[in-house]
């Protein structure tokens, strides 16, 4: 267990994002910082995109009919009444409408916001974070540009010049926040060698990185491998990393474990950042397929076959585009892998919306518009991104499940075509084996 010991300073933590999952993570972290005051500053900043909320008359927080600022409601009543209602938040969570003020002097940045806002947020953060900050991305999805694919933790690291790991798992935010039983998650963090002897040994990774996209990122000073080492796929890191000062506790597996682990939220630490990140993104495509099957009422036999095919394509995709950097056991054994797939294919939002679409005889896009107020599912955006990459690489035929799900979403294929994937996938595996 990490301990401050002779360290003169403590880590300050900021949660960037305050939605359902962001508020849940803030709750977890704030409980831990309160218990481990020798390692962390007790107060946890949570950046909130300011908006007005109307408190219902039957609410114990009702004061007037006038809309109130969400940050003021959270700080006064310690509850995110809009995105995590009914859950009491620790009083040491400070809701802050100013992004730059929220991250001031923070050495641990936890990113938990819709991926479409990440670029703008990183742009606003430039020049406002301490140079030795480290990040954890809770954002599920991938960033595809042309024939290359980037992880969101890579985007964060490149844009801000910091190292960033990833958190993902079989996590239903409302259940975790309510402390219903014990949930689990996986945190992938491979400390850069510049952080003293605390670092894990970097592993070689695939060169399948989109250099075109990378060139759009800020120019960062290249340093020697001896100081910064390699990034999440073995390339010489472009960012000039600043080591965590020796006056702070090390930011390693032990420190992150006590920051995120709770009696109701079990954390497994690994170094496979690519495997954890990809699992969190690709499982949403599989969940859509499972939802289509459920909507058809085809039963558990077809359901299990589709999930198996989905796992096979997830593993194949990860190894093809990220090479030896991905540990198969991350996908097959960790919460971020198979457990998240199972949960998403039983009760996840992508699953439920896909099933609803089939039962109503409408498109998933119509469900998004009517049931989600126009908000896009993670699965639909990821399916489109992944298909764009596969098409650019001429690899659509080698990923029949991923391809057919996207074609169903675009109205180019029927849900009835899904069972054929089992045979097609078997042939694909045999040909590539």
Swiss-Prot record:
PROSITE patterns: NAD_G3PDH (PS00957). Pfam families: NAD_Gly3P_dh_C, NAD_Gly3P_dh_N. GO terms for cellular component: cytosol; nucleus. The active site is at 283 (proton acceptor). GO terms for molecular function: glycerol-3-phosphate dehydrogenase (NAD+) activity; NAD binding. Substrate binds at residues 140, 349-350. Residues 208-227 have a biased composition (Polar residues). Its EC number is 1.1.1.8. Residues 187-246 are annotated as: Disordered. NAD(+) binds at residues 17-22, 49, 117, 173, 349, 378. Keywords: NAD, Oxidoreductase. GO terms for biological process: carbohydrate metabolic process; glycerol-3-phosphate catabolic process. Coiled coil: none annotated. InterPro entries: 6-PGluconate_DH-like_C_sf (IPR008927), 6PGD_dom2 (IPR013328), G3P_DH_NAD-dep (IPR006168), G3P_DH_NAD-dep_C (IPR006109), G3P_DH_NAD-dep_N (IPR011128), NAD(P)-bd_dom_sf (IPR036291). It catalyses: sn-glycerol 3-phosphate + NAD(+) = dihydroxyacetone phosphate + NADH + H(+). It is an enzyme of class 1 (oxidoreductase). Belongs to the NAD-dependent glycerol-3-phosphate dehydrogenase family. This is Glycerol-3-phosphate dehydrogenase [NAD(+)].
């Amino acid at each position: 267990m990490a301990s401050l010991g002779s360290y003169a300073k403590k880590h300050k933590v900021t949660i960037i994002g305050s939605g359902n999952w962001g508020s849940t993570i803030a709750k977890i972290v704030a409980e831990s910082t309160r218990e481990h005051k020798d390692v962390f500053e007790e107060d946890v900043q949570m950046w909130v995109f300011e908006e007005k909320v109307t408190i219902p008359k039957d609410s114990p927080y009702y004061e007037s009919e006038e809309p109130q600022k969400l940050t003021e409601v959270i700080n006064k009543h310690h509850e995110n009444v809009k995105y995590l209602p009914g859950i009491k938040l620790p009083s040491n969570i400070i809701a802050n409408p100013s992004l730059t003020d929220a991250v001031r002097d923070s050495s641990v940045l936890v990113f938990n916001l819709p991926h479409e806002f990440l670029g703008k947020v990183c742009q606003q953060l430039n020049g406002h974070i301490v140079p030795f900050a480290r990040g954890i991305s809770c954002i599920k999805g991938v960033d595809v540009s042309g024939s290359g694919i980037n992880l969101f933790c890579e985007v964060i690291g490149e844009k801000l010049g910091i190292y960033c790991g990833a958190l993902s798992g079989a996590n239903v935010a409302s259940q975790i926040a309510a402390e219903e039983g014990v949930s689990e998650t996986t945190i992938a963090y491979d400390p850069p060698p510049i952080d003293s002897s605390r670092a894990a040994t970097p592993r070689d990774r695939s060169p399948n990185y989109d250099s075109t996209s990378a060139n759009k990122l800020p120019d960062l000073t290249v340093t020697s491998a001896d100081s910064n080492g390699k990034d999440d796929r073995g390339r010489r890191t472009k960012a000039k990393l600043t080591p965590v000062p020796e006056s702070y506790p090390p930011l390693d597996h032990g420190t992150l474990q006590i920051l995120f682990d709770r009696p109701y939220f079990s954390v497994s630490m690994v170094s496979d950042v690519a495997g954890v990140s990809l699992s969190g993104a690709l499982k949403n495509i599989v969940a859509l397929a499972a939802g289509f099957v459920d909507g058809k009422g085809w039963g558990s036999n077809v359901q299990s076959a589709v999930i198996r095919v989905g796992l096979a394509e997830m593993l194949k995709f990860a190894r093809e585009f990220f090479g030896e950097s991905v540990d198969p056991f991350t996908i097959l054994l960790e919460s971020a892998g198979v457990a998240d797939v199972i949960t998403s294919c039983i009760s996840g939002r992508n699953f439920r919306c896909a099933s609803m679409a089939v039962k109503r005889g409408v498109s998933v896009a119509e469900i998004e518009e009517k049931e989600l107020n126009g908000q896009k599912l993670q699965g639909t955006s990821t399916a489109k991104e992944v298909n764009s990459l596969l098409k650019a690489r001429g690899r659509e035929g080698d990923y029949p499940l991923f391809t057919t799900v996207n074609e169903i979403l675009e109205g180019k294929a029927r849900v009835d075509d899904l069972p054929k994937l089992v045979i097609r996938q078997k042939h694909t595996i045999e040909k590539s084996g």
